Regions:
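Acidic, mature catalytic/reactive cores of soluble proteins
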Residues: 1-140
Length: 140
């Protein structure tokens, strides 16, 4: 999900993914392969074992948080997450200009952001007066 509106941290551009184990243990491969300045700039990488990875080029940076040990090869960071039944894991991809602090979001913050996002979109759709494609718009 991408938090909607001006929620808890409007200065941060993030995409969140929740991985929830239902049955069996599933291994996810997580890859980050950013292309800065239309692939004209190479990233400088910093690894944060057990927490995530950051790629920076010039004044731009992306950080992928998620309790993953990454390995960087060329312009790509790859790691793995195992999710078992009843387990919930989060990934948060964050873009910032001039990223400095390493601040992984906690599970509570991510859960609250999900709740806020759902509430935002429910309020938005409640005002939708579209006819014809309303069901498709609502579902999306």
């Amino acid at each position: 999900m991408m938090p909607g509106g001006s929620l808890r941290r409007p200065d941060v551009n993030r995409i969140h993914r929740r991985l929830r184990g239902v049955s069996g243990t599933v291994r996810f491969r997580v890859t980050l392969e950013p292309r800065f300045d239309y692939a004209r700039r190479e990233a400088t990488w910093s690894l944060h074992p057990g927490s995530g990875v950051r790629a920076v080029a010039g004044s731009e940076g992306v950080t992928l948080y998620g309790g993953v040990d990454f390995a960087v090869n060329g312009g790509r960071a790859t790691g793995f997450i195992d999710v078992s039944p009843g387990e919930t894991r989060w990934l948060a991809l964050e873009y910032r200009e001039r990223p400095t602090l390493w601040r992984p979001p906690g599970a509570r913050e991510l859960d609250e952001t999900l709740d806020d996002t759902i509430a935002y979109w429910r309020r938005w759709i409640s005002r939708c007066v579209m006819t014809g494609y309303r069901e498709a718009v609502t579902r999306s």
